[in-house]
Amino acid sequence: MSDALFDLTGHTAIVTGTSRGLGQHFARALAKSGADLVLTSRCRESLLSFEEEIKSFGRRAISVELDVRDQQSIKRMVEVAEAAFSHLDILVNNAGCNVRKPAIDVTWEDWNLILDTNLRGSFFVAQAVAQHMIKRQYGRIINIGSVTSVAGYAGLGPYGASRGGIRQLTMSLA
């Protein structure tokens, strides 16, 4: 049993974007609270040492390659996760990217990369995982946002738009 304030023993959590930063912090907190983890990143090899760290907390963990911009990658991740764990209880939609530059310099490719990763990817990962949560009649989806969803910052136009979209999407799905 976990010593944490919120006991998640017996639950499985998927955290997208766990190769570094916030994703690793979220995964550590979930593991310390007793959850087993599905760690995801575009580069599975970048997760392997972190997977061992999670296992050192006495939790089960797997590392799965996931590009949230690719529907087949999402489908494969869910299949691998479901095969490894009997249920998928928690999703932390954390994967994201940013290209910080003045609006006048943002390219079509920059815009698509940011929106496809941060907004479209979050939606379709949530959709795929929610189908499994509905079968079990239990699940929690946490979408990671940003203050840029409510305040404008120079050089963060596409990023702010994507996070504003996440904010609206989250309210719509709730």
Q: Where in this protein do the model-derived segments appear?
A:
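Substrate-binding pocket helix/loop in short-chain dehydrogenase/reductase
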Residues: 102-103, 110-115, 141
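Conserved glycine-rich cofactor-binding loop
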Residues: 12, 19-21
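Residue(s) in the substrate-gating loop at a strand-loop-helix junction
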Residues: 146
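Active-site helix of classical SDR
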Residues: 126, 162
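Active-site loop immediately N-terminal to the catalytic Tyr-X3-Lys motif
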Residues: 104, 151-157
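Conserved glycine-rich Rossmann-like NAD(P)H-binding loop of the short-chain dehydrogenase/reductase
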Residues: 35-49
